[in-house]
């Protein structure tokens, strides 16, 4: 009696196979298996008929077709099928697609938040059915995103003829946030101001306060995971003229100084919550300089290896069992940090799915022990997750805060200091400013002036967003969900709507033009509040409160279809009103210029693209731009000859009969060729697509390497098999 477990990622196969043992077959769908077909009106792949939606699905790729064919054969050999796709809305939808394609009648559905034997066996002991509400929400999201993306791109974006490729429900709202900030920066007018301060012989510095008895709000704010730990220099209340600054300095120098108030208090700083997807991306970006998509890639590998729980979650909950394990760990290793009762953190309103936060599966596997097994990026991210999780279950930190007010004549001066008196959770996660201790002085005491001065400063424009800060903003605005933050940012960069400049996201001219256009023709759709409301409605579908077909058909009928029709009618007028719209059809973004060279592969005029890559000998390269009908070929400057050349791999790319294998490319079905390369000084051979035109584009992931068993294997496509 054999059972089948269906999962998404091949990275879990080995671990789950070890857990389940004999009597089980574990197979991976390799992610999404089906997608909406590119047919029908505007290639939507679905029809809106009254209040119903007729969807037409097709295998996502030739590889997906092959996987489905193999799975159909396996299903015939087993007695029971368990769907164990990822435990979220997306995973539920993939499970439904598998059940549909494999014609499974009421398959078992199991979910687990960690790949460990106890978790997997507990899930198998309590199987359930596929959640139709989650599936409905997943299907609604797919149709909604394609409706907005395909129709908006075809009828609006392409009409700009400026190189912009697409718009999207989440993509365009996120771009709008970046462009709004860029507009604020462009319009910003700096203003001079002065910070006035005094320094005393007793050993502290105080700053001018116009109203000394007006206390600042010191309530504990939510920790900022996107912030890097930098000391914020104190300032006085802003003085707006040199004359007033000079007057205050004169008062300080000509009058005695006396302490009029000393305030001392001890506050408890609560530990931060364990990581959600968003806070992990923020912290990894700030502390490890990881891009959001790279953070998720590393977290995925840690999850698949069984080291951490599922990494797409907006919950800060930890299981009772794990909280008890952390408490036991602290009792054995850091008894002073054991709180009186278990620390519970509240998830934000609207948090989805009954998941745990991102945490280690075994708290006793410390970062030091883990780094002896795995090093590099995985070890660094694991340490971040372990430290944050343990910190979340520790005692609060205790901070002694002091505030001193002095007076000279009619001017008042304030000094603030703080000292950490009990570290608490900061032993593992230090998000508190460094100590700044003030001397022990008494009210009424006369203090001796050492120096008085005014420092001229300028107001600064609002900063551009880093990737962690943008993730934080998307979460706070309700744009997207944990699974969409990093792909959205990646898409904006790939579309050349934004670029990273000194670690900050800056909209390109192309991105600014597109946003300015959409702000006039579809202003609602790019507003954060509008997009957030749509996310809430998708959540309501997931909770069974809304019918997905009625919601989407009415949304299209009542808002999107008329808004799109109106926008299409305004394209020509709005286009003329935009700056830089005198560029010709298909012209490249501002960072690109036409080169006097034609593509050697397709004859299209090459484009000169600026680049800061240290790998290049010049500050640019040539590209056969697909936006203008090119094939994607690139050429680099040979500084010795002064000529542009194809990459070395393509100059030698004409396959010889001897190099062609009997295997076919899984993407374009051309033969795979043997390609020699060196790694660590050793000569090696890999199989790659033999077609130089598709190799840099749609076949770029086709790379098979020889295993110790003599088979050919690819990280993306798995083991290579000869056609039957």
PLM features: residue spans?
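Structured, non-catalytic alpha/beta "coupling" segments that mediate domain-domain communication
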Residues: 14-40, 172-220, 327, 335, ...
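C-terminal or mid-to-C-terminal helical accessory/interaction module adjacent to the motor/catalytic core
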Residues: 117-200, 268
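Short acidic, hydrophobic short linear motifs in intrinsically disordered regions
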Residues: 259-262, 270-284, 309-313, 461-473
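Intrinsically disordered, low-complexity regulatory segments
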Residues: 1-142, 148, 152, 239, ...
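Metal- or metallocofactor-binding catalytic centers and their adjacent structured scaffolds
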Residues: 226-273, 442-445
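Phosphate-interacting basic helix/loop segments used at nucleotide- and nucleic-acid interfaces
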Residues: 56-82, 177-181, 283-284, 381-390, ...
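Basic, low-complexity terminal or inter-domain segments flanking catalytic cores
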Residues: 2-3, 187, 229, 245, ...
């Amino acid at each position: 009696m054999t059972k089948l477990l269906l999962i998404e990622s091949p990275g879990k196969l080995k671990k789950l196979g070890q857990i389940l043992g004999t009597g089980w077959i574990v197979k991976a769908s390799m992610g999404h298996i089906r997608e909406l077909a590119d047919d029908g009106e505007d290639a939507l792949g679905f029809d809106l008929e009254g209040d119903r939606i007729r969807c037409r699905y097709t295998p996502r790729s030739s590889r997906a077709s092959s996987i489905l064919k193999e799975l159909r054969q396996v299903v015939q050999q087993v007695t029971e099928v368990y769907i164990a796709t990822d435990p979220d809305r997306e995973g539920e939808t993939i499970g439904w697609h598998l059940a549909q394609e494999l014609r499974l009648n009421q398959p078992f559905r199991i979910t687990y938040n960690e790949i460990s034997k106890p978790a997997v066996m507990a899930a198998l002991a309590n199987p359930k059915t596929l959640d139709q509400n989650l599936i409905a929400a997943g299907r609604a999201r797919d149709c909604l995103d394609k409706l907005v993306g395909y129709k908006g791109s075809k009828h609006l974006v392409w009409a700009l003829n400026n190189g912009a490729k697409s718009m999207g429900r989440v993509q365009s709202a996120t771009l709008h946030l970046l462009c709004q900030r860029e507009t604020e920066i462009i319009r910003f007018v700096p203003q001079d101001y002065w910070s006035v301060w005094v320094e005393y012989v007793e050993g502290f510095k105080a700053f001018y306060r116009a109203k000394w008895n007006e206390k600042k709000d010191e309530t504990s704010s939510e920790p900022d995971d996107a912030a890097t730990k930098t000391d914020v220099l104190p300032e006085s209340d802003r003085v707006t003229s040199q004359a007033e600054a000079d007057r205050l300095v004169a008062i300080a120098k000509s009058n005695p100084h006396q302490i009029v108030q000393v305030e001392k208090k001890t506050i408890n700083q609560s530990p931060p919550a364990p990581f959600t997807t968003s806070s992990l991306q923020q912290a990894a970006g700030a502390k490890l300089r990881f891009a959001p998509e790279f953070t998720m890639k590393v977290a995925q590998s840690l999850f698949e290896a069984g080291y951490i729980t599922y990494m797409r979650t907006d919950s800060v909950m930890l299981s009772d069992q794990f909280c008890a394990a952390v408490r036991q760990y602290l009792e054995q290793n850091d008894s002073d940090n054991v709180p009186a009762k278990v620390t519970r953190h509240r998830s934000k309103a609207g948090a989805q799915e009954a998941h745990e936060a991102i945490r280690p599966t075994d708290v006793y596997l410390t970062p030091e022990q883990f780094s002896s097994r795995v090093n590099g990026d995985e070890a660094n991210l694991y340490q971040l997750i372990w430290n944050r999780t343990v910190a979340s279950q520790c005692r609060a930190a205790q901070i002694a805060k002091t505030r001193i007010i002095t007076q000279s004549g009619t001017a008042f001066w304030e000094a603030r200091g703080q000292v950490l008196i009990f570290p608490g959770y900061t032993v593992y996660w230090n998000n508190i400013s460094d100590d700044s201790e003030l001397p022990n002085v008494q009210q009424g005491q006369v203090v001796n002036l050492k120096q008085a001065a005014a420092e001229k400063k300028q107001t600064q424009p609002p900063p551009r967003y880093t990737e962690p800060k943008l993730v934080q903003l998307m979460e706070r605005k309700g744009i997207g969900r944990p699974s969409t933050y990093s792909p959205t940012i990646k898409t904006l960069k790939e579309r050349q709507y934004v670029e990273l400049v000194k670690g900050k996201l800056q909209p390109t001219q192309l991105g600014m033009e597109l946003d300015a256009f959409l702000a006039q023709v579809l202003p609602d759709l790019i507003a954060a509040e509008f997009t957030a409301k749509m996310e809430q409605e998708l959540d309501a579908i997931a909770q069974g409160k809304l019918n997905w077909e009625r919601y989407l058909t009415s949304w299209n009928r009542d808002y999107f279809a008329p808004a799109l029709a109106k926008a299409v009618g305004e394209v020509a007028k709005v286009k003329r009103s935009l700056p830089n719209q005198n560029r010709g059809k298909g012209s490249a973004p501002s960072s690109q210029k036409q080169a006097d060279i034609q593509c050697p592969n397709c004859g299209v005029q090459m484009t000169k693209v600026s680049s800061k890559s240290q790998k290049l000998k010049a500050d640019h390269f040539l590209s056969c731009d697909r936006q203008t009908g090119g094939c994607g070929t690139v050429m680099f400057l040979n500084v010795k000859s002064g000529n542009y050349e194809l990459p070395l791999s393509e100059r030698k790319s004409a396959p010889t009969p001897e190099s062609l294998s009997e295997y076919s490319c899984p993407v374009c079905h051309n033969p795979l060729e043997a390609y020699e390369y060196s790694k660590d000084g050793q000569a090696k051979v890999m199989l790659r697509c033999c077609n130089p035109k598709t190799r840099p584009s749609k076949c770029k992931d086709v790379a098979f390497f020889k295993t110790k068993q003599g088979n050919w294997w690819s990280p993306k496509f798995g083991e290579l098999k000869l056609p039957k």
